[in-house]
Amino acid sequence: MTPVKAIGKFLDQPILTAKINKYIPPVLASGSCVVIGKTLNETPSSERKKEGGKLGIILGSTILSAIFAPKIASKITGRNTSKTLSVIKDENSKLVDTYISEYGKNELSKILEKSKTGLLSPNEISILFNKNKDIGDKLIPPPDNIKAKDIFKEIGWLSIFGAVPVAGGIVGGIAADRIYEKKEWKNKVPDKVNEGIYQYLANIFLCNIGAGIALGILEKLNIKSKMARCIGMVAGILLTGVIGGSVMANYIGNKLINPVIFKDKTEEKRTPELLDLSLHTDDIATVSLLSGLKWIEPSLPILYSISGYRAGIGYRNDKNPKSKHIKVSA
């Protein structure tokens, strides 16, 4: 096994994915503290209590939604939830014990014992697969390239997953304004709803659709190259999400949300910014996940929380220059 493949197998270890999952809530909490701290540092002392309270509600609602989003999406779509660390350790222990009982202790025993509860190094993985690929594949299953026929289930899961933090951000933002902006809160609702629609369509849903369409075309053309699949899905994301999503979100906001729901005929255009275009890290995660790289999955709550946060503060190309909220981009 080459060093590059060994590193890839290292990242594919189910125990690694489960450990990353375990640390996502504290990472989100720490990130929220940084956002609140930086915002309060830039806010006049007389406004800090109000700004801190509003941000706390928005971020709290967004983070809780993001943490529970995988289970909600799995419940709706029927997709299997990720295994917990304890379940993986138990399965690995049974697998190793069965192997040792059948073949006895040998040169792989030390590595196999370690694999029960811990991470194997790339060098240990290389030794394991060179000596016994069968047991290696059972402990570290190879990534599965999702076929076109299964793509809609995966896209459905990703799209619901992304919708939950955005909805949480909107709800948190409205609640925060309702508490701290008693007279003006209703006027701020349209921006939150429209930004939520923009974030969801341009940065999540249509990006997933674009990746899925591209994957379907590649399957139809019988193109198996992982590099070609990756490039194709990125192209689909750029065309449908970054470009098409922005146009569709603006149309819905100006023709439906503002005039019909909020009785406001004012039209505004939310344009993609440089950071919107360059920091589509959640799309990288989408491509990776659709390519079978499960270790990227734990990062989704963090990435989708960014969209939820921006929806919660009603970010609209910073049209309010007095806003002190940090402009995190998705």
Task: Describe each region flagged by the PLM.
Residues M1-A330:
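Glycine-rich, hydrophobic membrane-spanning regions of integral membrane proteins that mediate transport
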